[in-house]
């Protein structure tokens, strides 16, 4: 197939949805499809066979896009429409594949061009409003809910990335055309690590024998970085030799987090690196003893969880749906999103190397059995088989549903 893919993100940047898009593109390439990707003017090009990247025009003074809804995204989405119009006027496509809010454009395009549409559902749009504390407006939430229903019910095929989203699509009445494909490749990219694990500790002033807990990811409120800081302050009292290594965050976010750590007595055990190249994240993982995911809100499974399962390191996470869709107490330590609980669990893991090793081994076994790359590619092929089958049928007109 020749596919027009619409990705309203800074592709490629080392963060959630762009990682997911990267691996989807890799799978489609391996399956023999040709993809024209229309995306934001921000991000770096990646070399994938059968992929061409077309970027929207960059407006003055726009150099980055924060995660979640924003006015900047609205401007860039509008500019993407011009690039999309040029593509469809010059090329003939067999299918439209859209991500996030571009699903609404994808549904309209598919009807106009008479080709099938696949919606890649990475999150719930209404839930984004609360996750990113963007707005509490009931009107805006109803608008996002309406848009999501149009995208799901107006598509011939839907991919969901976690069980909660799959259940939501089923409740909408589109379960028969949706397929759950977990982001099993996580935040991995096809680049060799540039530094040995030992060099990571040296570079960031961490003693070779210090126990290290690692957090990697963004600093958005729902990620629970402040919870981790509070837990680190408690850990510092009993294990001042330990280090909590935090990889990620914009410079201003890192400065604020470091100030909070200083205020709460955690600064001596915390190391903030800021954003690091995606190819170096495996080295940070291997330089650590425990991997922490302290999320406090949301239902989507973090992409990093899947690569953590294969890492050979134990996972400590909050016992919320965002994690428990994949993690169980047999393959991870799950605790309430509370500083003392997180600190106590971290101290217990630090003090018990045998428990760490056993947890990591069981996690790797589950990853090999349930979350293999082969299964990911196979299910992507199934989604496109459904897309082709759905193209011959009539997609029902979306109906109004009660707001969730």
Question: What are the roles of these predicted feature ranges?
Answer:
Residues 191-206:
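A short helix/loop element that forms part of the nucleotide-sugar donor recognition site in Leloir-type
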Residues 164, 184:
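Carbohydrate-associated surface elements
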Residues 290, 307, 314-317:
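Short hydrophobic beta-strand element within catalytic cores of glycosyltransferases
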Residues 202, 348, 355-370, 376-382:
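A short, well-ordered alpha-helix in the C-terminal region of glycosyltransferases
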Residues 1-45, 91, 157, 235, ...:
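N-terminal subdomain of nucleotide-sugar transferases
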Residues 329-340, 348-354:
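Conserved acidic donor-binding segment of nucleotide-sugar-dependent glycosyltransferases
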């Amino acid at each position: 197939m020749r596919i027009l893919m619409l990705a309203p993100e800074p592709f490629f940047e080392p963060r959630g949805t762009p990682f997911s898009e990267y691996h989807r593109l890799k799978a489609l390439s391996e399956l023999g499809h040709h993809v024209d990707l229309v995306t934001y003017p921000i991000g770096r090009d990646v070399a994938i066979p059968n992929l061409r990247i077309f970027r929207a025009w960059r407006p003055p003074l726009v150099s980055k896009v924060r995660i979640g809804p924003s006015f900047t995204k609205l401007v860039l989405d509008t500019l993407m429409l011009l690039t999309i119009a040029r593509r469809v006027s010059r090329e003939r496509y067999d299918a439209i594949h859209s991500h996030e809010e571009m699903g609404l454009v994808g549904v309209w395009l598919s009807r106009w061009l008479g080709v099938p549409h696949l919606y890649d559902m990475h999150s719930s749009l209404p839930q984004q409003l609360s996750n990113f504390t963007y707005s509490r407006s009931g009107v805006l939430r109803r608008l996002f809910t309406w848009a999501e229903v149009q995208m799901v019910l107006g598509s011939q095929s839907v991919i969901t990335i976690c069980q909660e989203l799959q259940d939501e699509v089923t409740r909408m009445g589109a379960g028969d055309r949706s397929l759950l494909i977990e982001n099993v490749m996580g935040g991995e990219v096809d680049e060799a690590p540039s530094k040995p694990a030992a060099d990571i500790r040296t570079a960031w002033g961490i003693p070779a024998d210090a126990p290290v807990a690692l957090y990697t990811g963004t600093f958005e409120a729902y990620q629970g970085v402040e919870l981790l800081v509070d837990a680190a302050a408690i850990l510092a009292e009993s294990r001042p030799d330990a280090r909590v290594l935090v990889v990620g965050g914009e410079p201003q976010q890192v400065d604020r987090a470091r100030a909070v750590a200083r205020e709460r007595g955690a600064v001596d055990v915390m190391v903030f690196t800021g954003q690091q190249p995606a190819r170096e994240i495996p080295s940070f993982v291997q330089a650590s003893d425990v991997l922490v995911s302290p999320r406090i809100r949301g239902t989507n499974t973090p992409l990093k969880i899947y690569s953590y399962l294969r890492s050979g390191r134990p996972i400590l996470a909050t016992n919320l749906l965002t994690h428990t869709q994949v993690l169980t107490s047999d393959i991870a330590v799950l605790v309430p999103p509370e500083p003392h609980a997180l600190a106590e669990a971290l101290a217990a893991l630090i003090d018990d190397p045998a428990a760490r090793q056993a947890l990591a081994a069981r996690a790797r076994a589950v990853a090999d059995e349930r979350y293999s790359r082969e299964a990911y590619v196979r299910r992507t092929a199934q989604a496109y088989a459904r897309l082709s089958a759905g193209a011959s049928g009539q997609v029902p007109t979306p109906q109004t549903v009660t707001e969730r």
